[in-house]
Amino acid sequence: MSAAAPRLVVGLGNPGAEYTETRHNAGFRFCERLADKLGVRFSHESRFHGFVANARDAGVWLLMPQTYMNRSGQAVGALARFYRIAPAEILVVHDELDIPPGQLRLKFGGGLGGHNGLKDTSAHLATNDYWRLRIGIGHPGDRNEVVNYVLKPARREEQGQIDEALDRALAAWPMIARGEWNAATTRLNARPAALK
């Protein structure tokens, strides 16, 4: 398992006001909150196909691709190549259907779980070996409803649980920033008491 501190944090989502509050944009929401925590602002960088922020003090880039979910890898690959960031130094934050709202999973590598943003990212990085922070959004119960489900806002109770999960993820950021992945994984993957 990689022990490198992250040099790039990518939040996956879709651009445009109509998608801002959707379940699929959980990764964007994490990146926006992390930027606030680090005191940096995003600016649009066309060469990287997205909104980019450089937290120089933390030694990390933040990226929100503006390519739509299915082409996220175009932005990730462009920034990673330009700054010579290895896949093991990348953390991709995304929504996860197979995890209930309010729960998180931090992991390195592995399968893509049918997530099109991850599929494209892996294609552009030519590997699955990068860190992922999976933000649970729950499953609609019917696979035919998935597209409609992820492109709608969460119900109020679910959104509260997702927001609490984002708060826990931000609280673990100092560990992640130091490359203390095992400690961060233990902390983030634990089921919150309120959901037990």
UniProtKB/Swiss-Prot annotation:
Subcellular location field: Cytoplasm
Site, Discriminates between blocked and unblocked aminoacyl-tRNA: residue positions: 14
Enzyme Commission number, as recorded: 3.1.1.29
Residues under site feature: Stabilizes the basic form of H active site to accept a proton: 95
Pfam families tied to this protein: Pept_tRNA_hydro
Catalytic machinery residues: 24
Major localization class: cytoplasm
GO MF term (any one): peptidyl-tRNA hydrolase activity
Keywords in alphabetical order: Cytoplasm, Hydrolase, RNA-binding, tRNA-binding
Similarity annotation: Belongs to the PTH family.
Self-association state and partner proteins as the record states: Monomer.
NCBIfam families listed in its UniProt record: pth
Protein name from the UniProt record: Peptidyl-tRNA hydrolase
Taxonomic source organism: Aromatoleum aromaticum (strain DSM 19018 / LMG 30748 / EbN1) (Azoarcus sp. (strain EbN1))
Lineage, top ranks: Bacteria, Pseudomonadati, Pseudomonadota, Betaproteobacteria, Rhodocyclales
Name of the gene encoding the protein in the UniProt record: pth
